[in-house]
Curated annotation (Swiss-Prot):
It comes from Aeromonas hydrophila subsp. hydrophila (strain ATCC 7966 / DSM 30187 / BCRC 13018 / CCUG 14551 / JCM 1027 / KCTC 2358 / NCIMB 9240 / NCTC 8049). The gene is htpX. The chain crosses the membrane at residues 6-26, 36-56, 158-178, 200-220. Its EC number is 3.4.24.-. This is Protease HtpX. InterPro entries: HtpX_protease, Pept_M48_protease_HtpX, Peptidase_M48.
Length: 290
């Protein structure tokens, strides 16, 4: 329930902010809202705006959605090891020390998030800390630090923004063509019905184009995972990273959602690899082994 409320409130706030930004842009640039240029600006504002606002709020959302307890002062040996390990890896990767946190979950997983390389969060599940060896956990942390060092959060946000923009744009263009084709007259009843049909068509096309576009986003995500694995192998050692992946392959399916899933150590399985945010573990191990 808490996650649902956060989702609804956040999306409402995003819509309000983007609506204000859109009106300002139309006024300043003098763009006709009903023109193709106006439609493209509308789609770009909501396509990129939603992605970037989500990125800016990602740390805040992650902490509240998953109940991440940021370690301000280590209280035990495990927390001390966790903080010191991330600090060492961040130094070697050339980034500022991320915030480090733990969230309560029996699954073995971790994620990184944050709007900038020097303003990030690395969070691990309690299940990972208690189920993995120190060497395996070190490799997982190195994987997340590599995501931060590689700037993966911003990269995928840009890709998602481009995809969102064109999904919205082409859905409305195609819906307009279909609506014009089937409209027979311009009386009030037809206009009202046509407007409703247009909105339904836009919704259906956005769903369809969104599914197709997600293939592109997921492909980029899988490439970033291979790169993060390679970075982890440099920071923690190839054998440790392979051992961590082998341990993950024997664990339960992860429960992270949305952008947290994209930057977790392990992703959900899918009927098709095209829609997976992470490559199959056997492929990741094979890539590390060369």
């Amino acid at each position: 329930m808490k996650r649902i409320m956060l989702f609804l409130v956040t999306n409402l706030a995003v819509m309000l902010v983007l609506g204000v930004v859109l009106n300002i842009l139309f006024s300043v640039l003098g763009i006709n809202k009903s023109s193709i240029s106006g439609l493209l600006v509308f789609c770009a504002v909501f396509g990129f705006g939603g992605s970037f606002i989500s990125l800016l709020m990602s740390k805040w959302m992650a902490k509240r959605s998953y109940g991440v307890q940021v370690i301000e002062q280590p209280r035990n040996e495990t927390e001390h090891w966790l903080v010191s390990t991330v600090a060492r890896q961040a130094r070697e990767a050339g980034i500022k020390m991320p915030e480090v946190g733990i969230y309560d979950s029996p699954e073995m997983n971790a994620f990184a998030t944050g709007a900038r390389r020097d303003d990030s969060l690395v969070a691990v599940s309690s299940g990972l800390l208690y189920s993995m060896s120190r060497d395996e956990a070190e490799a997982v942390l190195a994987h997340e630090v590599s995501h931060v060092a590689n700037g993966d959060m911003v990269t995928l946000t840009l890709i998602q923004g481009v995809v969102n923009t064109f999904v919205m744009f082409f859905a409305r263009i195609v819906a307009g063509v279909i609506s014009n084709f089937f409209s027979s007259n311009n009386d009030e009843e037809s206009s009202s019905t046509g407007g409703f049909a247009y909105m339904i068509t836009v919704f259906v096309l956005e769903m369809l184009f969104g599914v197709l576009a997600s293939i592109i986003v997921m492909w980029f995500s899988r490439q970033r995972e291979f790169r993060a694995d390679a970075g982890a192998a440099k920071l923690a050692g190839r054998d440790k990273m392979i051992a961590a992946l082998q341990r993950l392959s024997r664990g339960a399916e992860p429960q992270l959602e949305g952008s947290m899933m994209a930057f977790g150590i392990n992703g959900k399985r899918s009927m098709s690899e095209l829609f997976m945010s992470h490559p199959p573990i056997e492929q990741r191990i094979a890539a590390l082994r060369g």
